[in-house]
Curated annotation (Swiss-Prot):
Family annotation (InterPro entries): CinA, CinA-like_C, CinA_C, CinA_KH, Competence-induced_CinA, MoaB/Mog-like_dom_sf, MoaB/Mog_dom
Top-level taxon: Bacteria
SUPFAM superfamilies cross-referenced by the UniProt entry: CinA-like, Molybdenum cofactor biosynthesis proteins
UniProt-listed HAMAP family: CinA_B
UniProt feature coiled coil, ranges: none
Signal sequence, start to end: none
SMART domains: MoCF_biosynth
Alphabetized PANTHER family for the sequence: NICOTINAMIDE-NUCLEOTIDE AMIDOHYDROLASE PNCC, NMN AMIDOHYDROLASE-LIKE PROTEIN YFAY
Family from the record: Belongs to the CinA family.
Protein name, as recorded: CinA-like protein
Amino acid sequence: MKKAAIITVGSELLEGLILNRNAQFLCQELKNLGYRVIKVSTVGDHLEDIAEEVRSLLPEVHLLILTGGLGPTKDDLTREAVAKALNRKLLLDYNLKTKIEEKVKKYHSKIPSNIEKQALVIEGAKVIDNPVGSAPGQLLEVDGKKVILLPGPPKELIPMFESLKELLKTPHAFYQVVLKYYSIPEAVLEDLLKEILYSQDRVEVATMADHVEGVRLRLTTSAEHREFLDELVEKILEKTGEYLYGMNDEKMEEVVVRLLKENKKTLAVAESCTGGMLSSLVVNVPGASDVFIGGVVAYSNELKKSILGVKEDTLRKYGAVSEQCVQEMTEGLKKLTEADICVAISGIAGPSGGTPTKPVGTVFIDLFEQNHSTVRYNFSGDRNTIRTRSAMMALENLRKHLKERGRS
């Protein structure tokens, strides 16, 4: 198996100011392409430090990827450092300079004088087009090895790396399927599947869990065992299909919007503790406007009464965090928006506000189409975790409701 290494450049990474998402993305992608990543290092914006890391790692690997440091400013030094490490010249590419200037003109009336720096190309390098930003990447061949320079922003790096995947693929490329679940605990899922998963040795199994994507079951095998993996997935879905919400890169909100379209249903939401988080997740999906009418953030009791028609008597008897309150929220929302399906969330996200009968993490979610479906949850975690889990569980309830509707 070919070896690879990654150098992420940027003092902001060493200072903990931003997360190193590029390393995570590249490690996953390189494994699937058949590489063994032997090292990921982070280097600050210092020319000699970057050059020394290149000199140190290149003899050990078949592929070396550097990210960051390709901008136009004084501390963007990756081009210069790689050129120095390889003892190659930096050459100004006038055609590239013109292309970069044309891109910059679309967003700025004046072209910065330092933009020329981004048109410096290491001797012998092939330019990698950046479809999103102004900083092009570079690809070099060095004694049969590949050295790739990519910009730091993930929104630029990811599409540029995607354009290189065919070039980088090895005979040892992996085939991977990720199955995503939300309303089933990781331990329960593994127990359901242990006989299927662990009675074979051709597929590597890994489970991961978080409050955003739920439980992810990652199945990886070599390309030669692809058919076996496909058959294994079929067996898994026979046992756990009712809990599955998506596969691979699918997000819960994308699945819900698709199901709303398939069922020809519209949606409106009323939120209290989530403060618009559920609405935000839905509208992040392209095409959501076809099915999403809108949302109301009714954080105070006054707004719950004046906009959604929640009764004063209900709030006094049962409180804002109650089955009765969320049901009146969805009923009022339905009158207000005439949406086919209405969802309401009200809860105690903390850190204060809990009581013995309704501790922090108590959340009520109601889904109302023709009848109410109300569930009380007791989520753990900090304030943001409770809010996120509430919004995601509302989506999961919607998904299950729409799937059931599609079967009837």
